[in-house]
């Protein structure tokens, strides 16, 4: 179904020229020609051609740091154009090509197929990207023996990268690698090192061929399904290790599971300090967990594939099983893989794996009784799957992931960063993660957030260890030691770990206009918990002096992060995690449906008041929807530790649950939060929350400025020292005054990038009119968002209206208008988008009240 806000790709002007050739002309192009993009009924055409991914940067040069790109998306940072010279973040090239290709955006939505589009191969014409040094083409149907022209493309991205290495030492213009549509299946990451950098202030682009969708796919396709028993199907899968993730018809399937009550621990696993590299201290933990034999069957094969997950108020942990035994008291004993089973019992503050309480056990074949679940028998190499309603296993696209990471950008010294790369219009899909390995054991445990315990350190807290006992997880895209790396207009989906991670010493880089969805952990992770100090040289420090660096000047703008922290065991991962960061700019993003909080900003609690590595961050004009779907004790925006110069302004929050299962807050300034300005928040939250904003005098919070909060409830604690905090203005029915409604309209993904938002997630009328508001009679201008098509009409009219005539109870604006007059008659109205044929496309959930 075609979205009402995203057209078919309007191919930008293409010109024939000799591909893979060197250009004698370098520098900035002169503006180029960007296609306006024709839009069908209900479609969207803005700026340059708004391709499937909605990219439209078609203008000329934009100076570094510019917040607009001429003719394009207007994304913060002046994101790279398609042609000409794009020397660094903030500098737009000037060629005319403006179709991103590849980002499925709203047309396809979260259920879009994984496969790429376009024929690839030898058809097509070469792309006129403006002045450049060279252009190469890659297609899944090409050959690495080819010269890399449009008629004879390479087959692999690594081949193109290696050829680029031979010509990029002293670049005279940008280099383009165009990826034709289709699946680029890999089993290990495509790596980029210093020798892969853009040089002489020029960039190297890896981007979609116009109108096509290249998919860097970390999975193998499973075929040959036959009926088994009880509605289950089976197929052969050549794999020797546990399968934790499976994707069927572009949707995640899950391992079989059952929630059971523990009978406590069994046995003891002792640890002696220094017995191995992971034994930082001595102690002991339970060696196994007991369950009733009526709850857990006798399991005789693939015992080491069993997993146990527990949930605390704000955390989840995973331990793995090595054996299943009968205990002396007549119970079933699941003996843990060690030493990770003991490590998982360490985290403090009630966040650890506990051998008592409620557990969810995964990977028992007998429990394969529900649609959308799978079981892999690695002993026989057989994959079993229970189809969802409507799935035909003879045609189903079943993807069994192999690769844990798809793109790995890294070097080992901050004197030799990877520089000046752009990845644009690409779909990154289908990764696995087999948990953290310590000796021969696996698991995933932490005290909080997108971190993982890596050693046994009993007797000390994470603060005592200066977080050296914590690490981050791998991601589908890993970036370290890099400068000016941009991800623009991509789709990142179906990850078994994190989405995009920029962990150590990444500077001047951008993540803009991406759709990030179905991620096991955080959609994006920036920084590292060990960056509380730089160069302090702890005994277990991950990053050596000269390698360690704060992530600085990272811009995250106009992204949709949807349905992340999806897997059990990953619940404490925020939609976006930022540890110690300097000048992080997080603006105009929409974070939707997260197990815990929308963004985790900061680290360190109150324990390191002299740390100066987290500062000058901005979190403005974002939208947070449907937070804390599993865990509690947080809010849409969560801050931790001091961060001088940080502003968190004009954010719109809709959907914080009540505290019946644990404490909940609209916003949460946790321990040590200080030197933060947090103004003009609009909080549409359940009246049963614990606090409107948890900024009370606890945990050494201080120097907070929180002004002009509007919320559906007023529940505030005692004010911390040196703080200025207004009492929230209460609007119980969430029908906001026009000024506050204006913040709602400005929040989230902007019009230039609206094509990344699936209509199935946010129908056009709710995109145009995102919140309820109240206006006095005679109001001539109520702000709205553009429907994206001037041929549409936008109406305020009474609910249920099917025939539209302007008058006292109905007002009209063009489909691309950004404001509309309120009806002159007092009453309650809805917003309708009507197509050029007069057909209403939908009635808004929000209302306008005219008084």
Give the location of each predicted region.
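Ser/Thr-rich, Pro/Gly/Ala-heavy low-complexity intrinsically disordered linkers and tails
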Residues: 16-134
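Extracellular polysaccharide-degrading/modifying enzymes targeting complex plant/algal/animal polysaccharides
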Residues: 135-481, 486, 533-538, 542-545
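Short, solvent-exposed loop/linker segments at the N-terminal edge
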Residues: 772-778
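Right-handed parallel beta-helix
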Residues: 419-430, 463, 483-497, 506-521, ...
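Extracellular recognition modules
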Residues: 830-834
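Short glycine/acidic-rich loop motifs that flank beta-strands on beta-rich extracellular proteins
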Residues: 188-189, 404, 432-438, 474, ...
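Extracellular beta-rich repeat passengers
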Residues: 260, 434, 659-762
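Short proline/glycine-enriched turn/loop motifs at strand-loop junctions of beta-rich domains
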Residues: 786-792
